[in-house]
UniProtKB/Swiss-Prot annotation:
The organism's place on the tree of life at top rank: Eukaryota
Membrane topology: Multi-pass membrane protein
Gene behind the chain: Ltb4r
Pfam families in the cross-refs: 7tm_1
Protein name: Leukotriene B4 receptor 1
One term under GO cellular component: plasma membrane
GO MF annotations in UniProt: leukotriene B4 receptor activity
Residues carrying a glycan: 4, 164
InterPro entries registered for this protein in UniProt: Formyl_rcpt-rel (IPR000826), GPCR_Rhodpsn (IPR000276), GPCR_Rhodpsn_7TM (IPR017452), Leukotriene_B4_rcpt (IPR003981), Leukotriene_B4_typ-1_rcpt (IPR003983)
Organism: Mus musculus (Mouse)
Keyword Lyase attributed: no
């Protein structure tokens, strides 16, 4: 996470103690919930899932991205507790670079999930051909490469500097044009464009599902939608504040004015709030698992994701595409293991 974010105010600064308390609480909750939760998801997929579906690979990489950013939380907690940055400039840049990579990887993975579902509904037979693990691995590799590249500005602008007799890890822009560029670049590439693609995908899905009778469409994409909404809820305020800051910078308003100070205070909290987005997904998996959590125990993640790879056959009936899982009755009742991406999709075969 990057752009014009500065580390939360030092506890030794005026009003800093109360300001630092909420970020400390949010970071601690994110670390306590997200670190074991995402580790459990990674362990479940790598150790307990014999045949990993494309969806499982996407979820695995999303959990890895979340783990990466959560591993930086102790450094920020140390800063909040001590009131000064103790990990030199290299630590400053690396911590924020990892946060930037994680943010981009997460939003790109969520976008791919949405596009995958849209393709499966709009072009099910094409989806069957391209939705293979080999192709998915190439896509995932591309996502990580792009994420590393998009986060490079953090390495360029981040530095350690003195502020009120304390060392802070903060951006250092040569001029206001660089600041505006970085703020807008992060908001557009890290949120606006990906979520336009997500909205377009689900608008197309909704339109097509109204015209076609898909099996189990009621459960289609439930968990993916929850993941998208959670990510938007945690990151939209952060990007909105950065856009406001960019506008104020272009207008030449004083950053030390009361409004500018309130904007900085809001950003301190929103940075910590964004960390919670990396801890919420395992909670969503548990909620979406329903009865699986009770029946399958620690294997509920595997059971939840196994449904995303069930084979589906497609036929035309009266001009309408009807998809029926193989080896199941023509009109099966939705079970607890119905996938969150496979309903009305042709899953990966030939893996």
């Amino acid at each position: 996470m990057a752009a014009n974010t500065t580390s939360p105010a030092a506890p030794s600064s005026p009003g800093g103690m109360s300001l630092s308390l909420l970020p400390i609480v949010l970071l601690s909750v994110a670390l306590a919930v997200g670190l074991p939760g995402n580790s459990f998801v990674v362990w479940s997929i790598l150790k307990r899932m014999q045949k990993r579906t494309v969806t499982a690979l996407l979820v695995l990489n999303l959990a890895l991205a979340d783990l990466a950013v959560l591993l930086t939380a102790p450094f920020f907690l140390h800063f909040l507790a001590r009131g000064t940055w103790s990990f030199r400039e290299m630590g400053c840049r690396l911590c924020h670079y990892v946060c930037g990579i994680s943010m981009y990887a997460s939003v790109l993975l969520i976008t791919i999930m949405s596009l995958d579902r849209s393709l499966a509904v709009a072009r099910p037979f094409m989806s069957q051909k391209v939705r293979t693990k080999a192709f998915a691995r190439w896509v995932l590799a591309g996502i990580w490469v792009v994420s590393f590249l998009l986060a490079i500005p953090v390495l360029v602008y981040r530095t350690v500097k003195w502020n009120n007799r304390t060392l802070i890890c903060a951006p250092n822009y040569p001029n206001k044009e660089h600041k505006v560029f970085h703020l807008l670049f992060e908001a557009i590439t890290g949120f606006l464009l990906p979520f336009l693609a997500v909205v377009a995908s689900y608008s197309d899905i909704g339109r097509r599902l109204q015209a076609r009778r898909f099996r189990r469409s009621r459960r289609t994409g439930r968990l993916v939608v929850l993941i998208i909404l959670a990510f938007a809820a945690f990151w939209l305020p952060y990007h909105l504040v950065n856009l406001v800051e960019a506008g104020r910078t272009v207008a030449g308003w004083d950053k030390n004015s009361p409004a500018g100070q309130r904007l900085r205070l809001a950003r301190y909290v929103l940075i910590a709030l964004a960390f919670l987005s990396s801890s919420v997904n395992p909670v969503l998996y548990a909620c979406a698992g329903g009865g699986l959590l009770r029946s399958a125990g620690v294997g509920f993640v595997v059971k939840l994701l196994e449904g995303t790879g069930s084979e589906v056959s497609s036929t035309r009936r009266g001009g309408t595409l009807v998809q029926t899982p193989k080896d199941t009755p023509a009109c099966p009742e939705p079970g607890p293991t119905d996938s969150f991406m496979t309903s009305s999709t042709i899953p990966e075969s030939s893996k």
